A protein has these predicted regions:
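Non-heme di-metal
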Residues: 1-148
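Feature captures hydrophobic
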Residues: 105-270
Length: 270
C-alpha cells in the first residue's frame, strides 16, 4: 500500500537533486520492498496453483479490506498539500497503485478481474486515472474509507456507488430478470436491473420492481460499504423492504455482503 506514494516521493527528490542521503536511503528501501513483493507474489502463485480454497480465502480477504485500505493515502483533514508539495495528486497515487496491483495479481495467476463479483468492481475499459478520480470522490464523500457518520450524497456520488453495486452483482445467482429499487429519504431513488447476465443501474423509479428498499443514504452506506448486517438493519427498521420475499432472500447471494466489521456502526444504526 505504501509503495505508490513512496515511488512518487522518491521520484520528486531524484528530479530535484536535493536530499541525496534521503534519496539513497529510499532507493535501498525500494529494493528491499521489491524483494518482499516478489516473494509474496511467488507464494501466492504456488498456493493458487495447488488449491481453489486459497483463491477463495484471498477473495474473501480482499472483499473485507479493500473499502478501508483505499483510505490509507488520505491526508489529514484532506489537506492535499501533503501530496501536491511533492508534485503529484492523490489521483496519481491511486491510478499508479491500481496499475501496480493489477500487474502483481496477474503475476499470481489469479488476476483481479477473475475474482468473484464485488471484489474489484471496476470497468476494466475505464482509464486508471478516471477510476482513481471516482474512488477519491467516494472517499471525500465519506462513502469509502474512514466512517464519518454523515456520508455526503449528490447525483455524481450516488451514480458512482450504484455503478459499483451493479458491477458487484452475481448474475449466476438469478434464474430470471430481476429489479431492485432503492427509495431514499434524503437522496434520489435508484434501481439496479439484472437481465440475461448483464446489470445496469439507473436513477429514478423502475417499473415493476421485484424488491423495494426504503432507507436513508447513511444507513445504506453502512450496509453497502462497511459490512453492517442488512438483516439487523431490517429488524431495526432502518431498511424497510417490500416486494418479493423470494428475491429478497436471494439478495445476499446476488450482492455478496462484506464481512461484518467489528467496529460500531455510525449514524442512526448506532
Amino acid at each position: 500500500m505504501a509503495q505508490p506514494a513512496q515511488h512518487f516521493i522518491e521520484d520528486f527528490f531524484a528530479k530535484a537533486g536535493s536530499l541525496p542521503g534521503f534519496s539513497a536511503g529510499m532507493e535501498k528501501v525500494s529494493r528491499d520492498e521489491q524483494r518482499h513483493i516478489g516473494f509474496g507474489v511467488k507464494v501466492l502463485y504456488e498456493l493458487f496453483a495447488e488449491s481453489e480454497e486459497c483463491k477463495a480465502a484471498a477473495s474473501e480477504m480482499l472483499r473485507e479490506i479493500l473499502p478501508f485500505t483505499l483510505a490509507v493515502m488520505v491526508p489529514p483533514n484532506w489537506d492535499e498539500r501533503y501530496t501536491t508539495e511533492y508534485g503529484f495528486e492523490l489521483e496519481d497515487i491511486y491510478a499508479f497503485g491500481m496499475r501496480s496491483v493489477e500487474m502483481k495479481w496477474k503475476a499470481t495467476g489469479y488476476p483481479l478481474h477473475d475474482h468473484p463479483p464485488g471484489i474489484y468492481p471496476f470497468d476494466p475499459e475505464m482509464p486508471h486515472r478516471e477510476r482513481a478520480q471516482r474512488q477519491v470522490k467516494l472517499l471525500r464523500a465519506g462513502v469509502l474509507g474512514e466512517p464519518n457518520g454523515k456520508p455526503r450524497v449528490d447525483p455524481e456520488v450516488e451514480g458512482i456507488l450504484f455503478d459499483v453495486i451493479a458491477r458487484s452483482a452475481d448474475t449466476d445467482a438469478i434464474d430470471r430478470p430481476v429489479t431492485f429499487q432503492w427509495k431514499f429519504e434524503d437522496a434520489e431513488p435508484y434501481y439496479v436491473r439484472i437481465d440475461n447476465g448483464s446489470t445496469s443501474a439507473g436513477r429514478g423509479l423502475a417499473d415493476h420492481a421485484d424488491v423495494t428498499l426504503s432507507t436513508t443514504w447513511a444507513d445504506w452506506v453502512e450496509v453497502a460499504t462497511r459490512g453492517y448486517d442488512a438483516r439487523l438493519a431490517m429488524l431495526r427498521r432502518k431498511i424497510r423492504p417490500r416486494g418479493s420475499l423470494r428475491q429478497l432472500a436471494r439478495m445476499p447471494k446476488i450482492f455478496p455482503p462484506r464481512p461484518a466489521s467489528s467496529r460500531q456502526p455510525t449514524g442512526s444504526l448506532q
